[in-house]
Amino acid sequence: MYEYINGLITNITPSYIVIASRSGVGYRLYSANPYRFEENVESHVYVQQIVRENDISLYGFIDADEKALFNKLLNVSGIGPKSALAILANGDAEGLISAVENDNVAYLTQFPGVGKKTAQQIVLDLKGKLDELASKTGMVDSSSNPEQSQALDDALEALLALGYTAKDVKAVAQIIGRNSDTTDGYIRSALKLLVK
């Protein structure tokens, strides 16, 4: 099983990329949106290997969180790798997580191969199970200051670890993220809002 591959992106097509590893092997990695990668650039691509009866395929992801969301989708009855990639293709992880948490079946049915029954199954299987990914996939606006952004990310992870839901954390993140602060300061501000 592979976790990631470091190498040179040598080819980009509408459905996959080819990455040449340093050992000289070229891997075909199916991707939700291959054009997010740059051709002829050394890249660190997260990989998921799927073994089927007559097929072994590799799927490539821009980061570990996208890979984790892909794997969560694969656990839903009726969702295979191609459907999971189609769902991830628009790059709106925030919208996907929000739709699952808010039972928005209409949003989920907009994806190819996802009908009403499958959308309901996605909500049933994943609701409440995406909390860890919520703060990592863009549900919180990033600051232009990297130190402030890291402090905010650390604070939000701490709140999730304390048992607050992703929905609550997202709500307070929009408020506390407006000001520059330390991790401790963000946590204190968030707790004041959450305890009310």
UniProtKB/Swiss-Prot annotation:
Record note on quaternary structure: Homotetramer. Forms an RuvA(8)-RuvB(12)-Holliday junction (HJ) complex. HJ DNA is sandwiched between 2 RuvA tetramers; dsDNA enters through RuvA and exits via RuvB. An RuvB hexamer assembles on each DNA strand where it exits the tetramer. Each RuvB hexamer is contacted by two RuvA subunits (via domain III) on 2 adjacent RuvB subunits; this complex drives branch migration. In the full resolvosome a probable DNA-RuvA(4)-RuvB(12)-RuvC(2) complex forms which resolves the HJ.
Function according to Swiss-Prot or TrEMBL: The RuvA-RuvB-RuvC complex processes Holliday junction (HJ) DNA during genetic recombination and DNA repair, while the RuvA-RuvB complex plays an important role in the rescue of blocked DNA replication forks via replication fork reversal (RFR). RuvA specifically binds to HJ cruciform DNA, conferring on it an open structure. The RuvB hexamer acts as an ATP-dependent pump, pulling dsDNA into and through the RuvAB complex. HJ branch migration allows RuvC to scan DNA until it finds its consensus sequence, where it cleaves and resolves the cruciform DNA.
Protein name per UniProt: Holliday junction branch migration complex subunit RuvA
GO biological process: DNA recombination; DNA repair
Gene it is expressed from: ruvA
Top-rank taxon: Bacteria
Annotated family: Belongs to the RuvA family.
Compartments where found: Cytoplasm
